[in-house]
């Protein structure tokens, strides 16, 4: 497994290009993979070539988040698939990036408890649209990773993958997001490991019921090793069951970045924990 991070945990000096600067910093930290976004720059082909060239020279594998709303129906769904496919194909033509993660759709407005069509119907819509997206980008060697994005439980994501039935539609497992849908993270990992090709490593401190001033169940973002996600056990599950554990990316990511958090320290703590406790899995 290859250790990396998402881009928002890396800070760069003011005036530095945010993507190029983060590639340099990731390499300086000894990481192997960096998750970035190119949604605002994918039409600038010269820029894509610069990004790809720097990443190759610094030996950083780049993975992107595609985004998209795959709950749409009819012509709206077809247009959304075409929009995302156009972006991914353009990026692939000018870079070595061949993996893009995506949620099913906007998690704040659509999830397993959202009123509306039955859950099974919603999941089938996502499967149909992602099947079309996978077909549209397969010729370029692109793999799509559907993430459990604070919306579905592991077995539900697995059902979507199985229904879509495309070899280049796999999973980006987020280890901490399981808590957001009241699921044990290791149960989620067991359900998704056979499809997982990328992973957001996340830790969350859980309080089953907090007192005043904020009553109720709490899930708080913390650096790796300071919460209740058993990421070492999850990595063992992935080692045993993932299709290609040696090439599986482990990207450190916060559940959210607390207002008073120092991103650099958050990442440093997470990297140090990973290199100690996940050493048997890292390549």
Model-derived features: positions:
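A short alpha-helix capping/helix-coil boundary motif
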Residues: 2-4, 29-32, 66-69, 110-114, ...
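Short glycine-rich, flexible loops that bind phosphorylated cofactors or substrates
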Residues: 43, 109, 208
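Histidine-acidic metal/acid-base catalytic patches
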Residues: 1-11, 16-27, 154-168, 179-283
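N-terminal pre-domain/capping segments
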Residues: 1-95, 268-283
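Active-site beta-loop-alpha junctions enriched in small/polar residues
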Residues: 6-10, 37-41, 67-71, 105-107, ...
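Hydrophobic faces of well-ordered beta-strands that scaffold small-molecule active sites
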Residues: 2-8, 34-36, 62-66, 100-102, ...
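Active-site acidic/histidine proton-transfer and metal-coordination neighborhood
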Residues: 56-61, 74-170
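Residue-level preference for long, well-ordered alpha-helices that form the structural scaffold
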Residues: 15, 44, 77-81, 115-122, ...
């Amino acid at each position: 497994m290859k250790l990396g991070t998402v881009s928002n945990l890396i800070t760069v000096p003011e005036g530095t290009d945010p993507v190029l600067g983060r590639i340099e910093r990731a390499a300086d930290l000894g990481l192997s993979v960096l998750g970035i976004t190119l949604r605002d720059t994918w039409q600038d082909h010269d820029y894509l070539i610069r990004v790809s060239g720097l990443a190759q020279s610094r030996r950083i594998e780049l993975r992107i988040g595609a985004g998209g709303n795959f709950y749409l129906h009819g012509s709206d769904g077809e247009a959304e698939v075409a929009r995302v496919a156009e972006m991914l194909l353009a990026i692939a033509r000018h870079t070595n990036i061949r993996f893009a993660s995506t949620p099913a759709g906007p998690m704040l407005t659509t999830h397993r408890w959202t009123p509306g069509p039955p859950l099974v119907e919603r999941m089938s819509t996502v499967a149909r649209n992602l099947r079309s997206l996978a077909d549209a980008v397969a010729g370029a060697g692109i793999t799509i990773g559907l993430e459990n994005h604070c919306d579905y439980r592991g077995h539900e994501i697995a059902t979507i993958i199985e229904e879509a039935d495309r070899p280049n539609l796999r999973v980006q497992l987020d280890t901490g997001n399981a808590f957001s849908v009241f699921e044990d993270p290791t149960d989620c990992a067991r359900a998704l490991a056979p499809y997982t090709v990328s992973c957001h490593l996340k830790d969350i401190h859980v309080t089953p019921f907090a007192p005043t001033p904020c009553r109720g169940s709490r899930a708080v973002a913390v650096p790796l090793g300071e919460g209740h996600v058993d990421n070492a056990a999850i990595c063992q599950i992935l080692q045993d069951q993932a299709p290609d554990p040696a090439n599986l990316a482990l990207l450190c990511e916060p559940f959210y970045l607390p207002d008073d958090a120092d991103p650099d320290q958050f990442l440093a703590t997470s990297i140090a924990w990973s290199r100690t406790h996940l050493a048997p899995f890292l390549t």
